[in-house]
Amino acid sequence: MKRIAALLTVYNRCDTTLRCLRELEKQKLPQGFIVDIYLTDDGCTDGTPQRVASEYPHVHIIKGNGNLYWNRGMLKAWEISANNQHYDYYLWLNDDTILIPDAVKILLDNSKKVNNKSIIVGATSDVKTHSIVTYSGYKGDKMRIIPNGKLQLCEYFNGNIVLIPQAV
């Protein structure tokens, strides 16, 4: 069995977070893969952690202090997940990222192509048109990498959807 820790940090976007979790739960994973979800609540006041706990009782909710923001919230989720269980992969996911049904499988397939020795960055597109890439990897001075169906080298990335193999 291969394990993936999905890591999210949230702040006052209850409906957005629930939609993201719904799409994550619907993922068509390769056989033998399971996903555990670690969600850092960085001081939500809109009921997000309570709704998540009610609708997704298996999600590990980590309490933040309101000063973690995205970066340190993701680090906290990573540290707790790594101390809790051995994971083969870590999936960074923004709560406003709506996954296509096989998004995680595509990331895993691409990771396998490079023997799980590279960070795989996903691209996101405009939710209405699906034709405009909104976030992805970058090269040089803010040159956004446009998906072309092949693996492409990037120098830095936003982090909306990123697969990090344990080997990295």
Placement of each model-derived feature along the sequence:
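Short alpha-helix within the catalytic core of nucleotide-sugar-dependent glycosyltransferases
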Residues: 21-22, 49-50, 75, 101-112
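A conserved hydrophobic helix/loop-capping motif in glycosyltransferases and polysaccharide synthases
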Residues: 4-16, 20, 27, 40
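Active-site acidic Asp-centered loop
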Residues: 42, 64, 93-95
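A conserved acidic beta->alpha catalytic loop
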Residues: 40-50
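Glycine-rich, basic loop-to-helix element that forms the pyrophosphate-binding segment
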Residues: 64-82
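Short, acidic, metal-binding catalytic loop of nucleotide-sugar glycosyltransferases
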Residues: 23-33
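Acidic/His-rich active-site region of diverse nucleotide-sugar glycosyltransferases
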Residues: 98-168
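Short beta-strand-to-loop acidic/aromatic patch adjacent to the donor-nucleotide binding site
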Residues: 86-98
